[in-house]
Amino acid sequence: MTTLRIATRKSPLALWQSEHVAAALRQHHPGLEVVLVPMSTRGDEVLDRSLAAIGDKGLFLKELELAMLRGDADCAVHSFKDVPMELDDPFVLPAILERGDPADALVSNLYASLQALPLGARVGTSSLRRQAQLRAARPDLELIDLRGNVNTRLAKLDNGGYDAIVLACAGLQRLGLDERISARLDAPEWLPAPAQGAVAVECRGDDARIHSLLAVLDAGRTRACVEAERAMNRALHGSCHVPVAALARWEGEGLFLQGMVGSASDGRLIHADAHGSADDTQDLGRRVAQGLFDKGAAQLLAAL
């Protein structure tokens, strides 16, 4: 086989990520032709409700997975934070690329920080995780749902609908929009979504040739971090659309994992953290989840 077909969403960020994967594959496999197969997903098309309100798992994956099952694509590229905790058979993730910036960004045309926003400022985000942390930091803010791709959200800000919006740093940086970042929202005060900033490549587990072609892109240190974060989320019975945050980083030869569960309605936040071995990321994730449960996380999650 001399051609590899990558199923991808049509947004500028998704196309950038898929072309980034394609370029890396061409470099590793001279002579391999890599082409993109752009398509729309339910998550792209339903824009009048928040992701949490839509509720389906795999909102940004299903159409891409169907393309692989039909034989119309060989693999798919995803923002890892959008990937459900459990993949359907026969799908696997042979490659997780080196992580970009995991932090969130405050974007505003007038204000340089979260604390600089005026009383009652209008802030756009549909993420329950971001809403919970915004309410904790600034309970006076008016939080307004905001959906669409990065450029659509920026246009809504520029048209005066919001005083500020919250986006992922990695998405802005990948699109060459670093200058739009007014302030980074950083750990430990502010935590990102599990696996935020990481790109995952999915394929059929029963296609050994495709799996082998893709596996050369896997970044082991990134995989360890995001697997610990997702293990915590899985132990909380969470999904991509609940107010759960996590960030793991390397400390020496091991990992340090910080986790958070929040309430988007009143800004209550529960934090826990732990150190653990990179050889047992599942145990580390479970221990941080248990620390959150011990502090009352189940009650916050049950209120959703």
From Swiss-Prot:
<dbReference type="GO" id="GO:0006782">
    <property type="term" value="P:protoporphyrinogen IX biosynthetic process"/>
</dbReference>
<dbReference type="Pfam" id="PF03900">
    <property type="entry name" value="Porphobil_deamC"/>
</dbReference>
<dbReference type="Pfam" id="PF01379">
    <property type="entry name" value="Porphobil_deam"/>
</dbReference>
<dbReference type="InterPro" id="IPR022419">
    <property type="entry name" value="Porphobilin_deaminase_cofac_BS"/>
</dbReference>
<comment type="pathway">
    <text>Porphyrin-containing compound metabolism; protoporphyrin-IX biosynthesis; coproporphyrinogen-III from 5-aminolevulinate: step 2/4.</text>
</comment>
<comment type="function">
    <text>Tetrapolymerization of the monopyrrole PBG into the hydroxymethylbilane pre-uroporphyrinogen in several discrete steps.</text>
</comment>
<keyword id="KW-0627">Porphyrin biosynthesis</keyword>
<dbReference type="GO" id="GO:0005737">
    <property type="term" value="C:cytoplasm"/>
</dbReference>
<dbReference type="InterPro" id="IPR036803">
    <property type="entry name" value="Porphobilinogen_deaminase_C_sf"/>
</dbReference>
<keyword id="KW-0808">Transferase</keyword>
<feature type="modified residue" description="S-(dipyrrolylmethanemethyl)cysteine">
    <location>
        <position position="240"/>
    </location>
</feature>
<comment type="subunit">
    <text>Monomer.</text>
</comment>
<dbReference type="GO" id="GO:0004418">
    <property type="term" value="F:hydroxymethylbilane synthase activity"/>
</dbReference>
<dbReference type="InterPro" id="IPR022417">
    <property type="entry name" value="Porphobilin_deaminase_N"/>
</dbReference>
<protein>
    <recommendedName>
        <fullName>Porphobilinogen deaminase</fullName>
        <ecNumber>2.5.1.61</ecNumber>
    </recommendedName>
</protein>
<comment type="similarity">
    <text>Belongs to the HMBS family.</text>
</comment>
<dbReference type="InterPro" id="IPR022418">
    <property type="entry name" value="Porphobilinogen_deaminase_C"/>
</dbReference>
<dbReference type="InterPro" id="IPR000860">
    <property type="entry name" value="HemC"/>
</dbReference>
